């Protein structure tokens, strides 16, 4: 199945600190990424999991777990492992922006509005798509509208082999409905399965792409 394959997975959310008390983040639980890591281990893969903050237990049998907090930290660690990776699955909910300036002391409340200037974080998957050699890249598109249309745009723009499209409202839940879309635009819709089952379904498509590549 995935024997001798090196699989790099990102999961969880990122935290972008504003001051020692406040930060920017999102509602991602990290469940999907952790389920993917567990499925990859069960299928014989050599897995590295780079995770932002979660409340989850580390997958059984995982040998390489890397904890990060910010998007920049995650970007640096992905860069570190990407070259020696066969399959990269970007499942983390990474902040698009971070505060331009971190305040070392708590920002005090005042009578005026607080304006925080934000700057863009690196687009990890886009950057890896540019660096891609023989790696198979899998991305996720959590959208609120025009789900498939937006997923197809990401698939092409980020040079992906597979994208998993779903409704952003399912973030943090135990189950999901997704559409798995391949580079050739063929797709499989999977309705309302728990995330562990979905993880195996996603790897089924990954394995089919790997097999197709060998036969070409």
How should each PLM-predicted stretch be described?
Residues 1-216:
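A cross-family phosphate/adenosyl-ligand binding-site feature
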């Amino acid at each position: 199945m995935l024997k001798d394959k090196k699989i790099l997975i990102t999961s969880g959310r990122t935290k972008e600190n504003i001051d020692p008390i406040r930060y920017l983040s999102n509602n991602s639980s990290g469940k999907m990424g952790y389920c993917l890591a567990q499925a990859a281990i069960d299928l014989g893969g050599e897995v590295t999991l780079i995770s932002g903050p979660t409340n989850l237990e580390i997958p059984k049998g995982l040998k390489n777990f890397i904890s990060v907090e910010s998007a920049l930290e995650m970007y640096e660690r992905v860069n570190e492992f990407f070259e020696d990776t066969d399959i990269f699955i970007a499942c983390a909910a990474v902040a698009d922006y971070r505060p331009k300036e971190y305040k070392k002391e708590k920002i005090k409340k005042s009578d005026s509005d607080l304006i925080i200037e934000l700057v863009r974080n690196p687009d990890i998957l886009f950057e890896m798509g540019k660096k891609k050699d023989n790696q198979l890249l899998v991305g996720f598109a959590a959208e609120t509208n025009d789900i498939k249309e937006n997923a197809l745009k990401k698939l092409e723009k980020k040079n992906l082999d597979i994208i998993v499209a779903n409704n952003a409202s399912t973030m943090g839940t135990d189950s999901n409905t997704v559409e798995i879309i391949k580079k050739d635009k063929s797709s499989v819709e999977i309705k309302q399965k728990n995330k562990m089952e979905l993880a195996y379904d996603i790897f089924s498509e990954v394995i089919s792409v790997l097999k197709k590549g060998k036969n070409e």
